[in-house]
């Protein structure tokens, strides 16, 4: 994903920002995007980044946390959603792509009832706070009204 999006922004005025708490993941991102420009890398928590006031985001790819145990990841995902809505950081008509929503691990390992797994709290919250559901499959796409 990082390489593909990195290639897509080449020759544009689009800034591509990748954030991860794990420095090894950021180093891997740097390796796979070597030679590309318009990319910023930040080793920090998603919550710190989202609350930093870095301006408006047109496209946000959320790939938060682990699939097991699911509850801490779902709670983090909700906190991220609260920051997204509360700080008004998504531009009008901006898009959020949430990955791994329908991953079956939480149902199998944690006996999770929700079909939304790690996004079981964040999706309902975002839908009540200015976002529309555009696609509801393995990945979920939301768009700001």
Locate each region found by the language model.
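Catalytic metal-binding/acid-base residues of hydrolase active sites
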Residues: 22, 47, 65, 101-102
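Generic enzyme active-site microenvironment
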Residues: 18, 61, 97-98
């Amino acid at each position: 994903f990082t390489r593909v999006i990195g290639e897509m922004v080449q020759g544009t005025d689009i800034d591509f920002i990748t954030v991860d708490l794990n420095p090894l993941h950021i180093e891997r991102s740097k390796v796979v995007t070597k030679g590309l420009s318009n990319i910023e890398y930040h080793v920090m928590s998603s919550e710190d980044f989202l609350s930093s006031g870095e301006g408006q985001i047109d496209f946000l790819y959320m790939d938060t946390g682990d699939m097991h145990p699911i509850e801490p990841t779902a709670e983090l995902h909700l906190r991220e959603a609260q920051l997204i809505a509360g700080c008004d950081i998504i531009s009008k008509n901006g898009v959020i792509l949430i990955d791994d929503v329908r991953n079956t691990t939480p149902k199998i390992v944690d006996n999770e009832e929700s079909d939304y797994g790690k996004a079981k709290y964040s999706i309902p919250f975002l839908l009540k706070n200015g976002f529309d559901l555009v696609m509801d499959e393995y990945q979920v796409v939301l768009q700001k009204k």
